[in-house]
Design a protein with these regions (language model features):
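A short, conserved acidic/glycine-rich loop-to-beta-strand motif
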Residues: 1-3
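Conserved nucleotide-sugar donor-binding catalytic segment
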Residues: 5-104
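C-terminal, non-catalytic tails of nucleotide-sugar-dependent glycosyltransferases
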Residues: 29, 34, 69-72, 87-189
Length: 194
């Protein structure tokens, strides 16, 4: 189901569920779930060697691989209350994401090969959504003459290329009414003096 988070974050988190290809880009289901025991036994249950996180995601991939036409549905109502804290396993495992992903990819290589386009497009969709979200926040901060973070200033000085970063930087810079941005302009913005 959807989750109501409390603690540090008070929000409604809406996982999407989906078919095997949807789960290759990200975990689309919370760890709290209902399934038939036969399904658990057929896929072998949780991989107990996964102690650092993502074991539920890996389990869902294993489960869906045993049922290629399978689909994990999500109840579209927040039936789960989920406590959030800076040191919770959900937060700390994200710091290890790039270390944990190779294990998942290698273990489920056939699925990744069969659905490579879906996997890449799913990751790209998340990346683009985050980039647009950050860009919107940058534009809001500039219009409100708020101080920019050092990370945002560094990005504007050296935008990424090939992932939409340069395009975002150009759109952000277009708000600047004094011609092309220069490093001095960014330094002034870090002091909230646009």
């Amino acid at each position: 189901s959807w989750m109501h988070t409390f603690g540090v974050l008070d929000a409604i988190v809406c996982p999407s569920g989906g078919s095997p290809s949807a789960f290759l880009a990200r975990n689309c289901c919370p760890a709290t779930h209902i399934l038939r025991r036969a399904v658990w036994e057929q896929c072998g249950g949780y991989d107990e060697s996964m102690r650092s996180g993502f074991e539920d995601w890996e389990f869902f991939l294993s489960m869906l691989e045993t049922m290629p036409e399978g689909y994990i549905g999500i109840v579209e109502s927040p039936l789960i209350d989920y406590r959030t804290a800076p040191a919770s396993s959900n937060v700390t495992s994200m710091a290890k994401r790039l270390e944990l992903m190779p294990f998942i990819i290698e273990k489920h290589m056939t699925s990744y090969q069969n659905y490579v386009m879906d996997a890449i497009l799913g990751i790209e969709a998340s990346s683009v959504a985050r980039l647009y979200g950050w860009e919107s926040e940058m534009m809001h901060a500039i219009k409100a003459e708020q101080e920019l973070s050092q990370e945002s200033i560094a990005f504007m000085e050296h935008p990424t290329y090939g992932d939409g970063g340069m395009a975002a930087a150009v759109r952000i810079a277009s708000l600047h009414d004094r011609g092309p941005w220069k490093k001095d302009d960014l330094e002034q913005m870090s002091n909230a003096e646009i």
